[in-house]
Amino acid sequence: MIMDNLKENHINTEYIVTVPDTTTGTAHITLAEGDNSIIVIAGANAKVDKNVVDNAWSAIEQADLVMVQNEIPIPTIEYIVRRCHEANVKVLLNPAPAADLNPEWLELATYITPNEHELS
């Protein structure tokens, strides 16, 4: 269903990987009294690894900007940030949901967009 929608809207799906017996990652957001709570179910996003990145590298290295967030495994994010840095590809890191990140590779991101929770 999602793939059909993307294709109908002329979005390139060449590098989308279907993971058998795994659901699509989802996030459920609730809002009460101006404060939000988010429940993330990683699903297939938890399966994104170096192999997925390597298979899509020819497209990634041509990008003007690569956006990553903490909804895929942290080692994969680190791998993406390092490879992009080496290839002079700008990286926007959205550190959501909040997690402990290694400052050594965090400095390699071009832009970081934390909210008030991730910043603390």
What is each PLM-predicted segment?
Residues 65-120:
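Conserved beta-alpha-beta core of the PfkB/ribokinase-like small-molecule kinase fold
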Residues 1-65:
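Conserved N-terminal subdomain of the carbohydrate kinase-like
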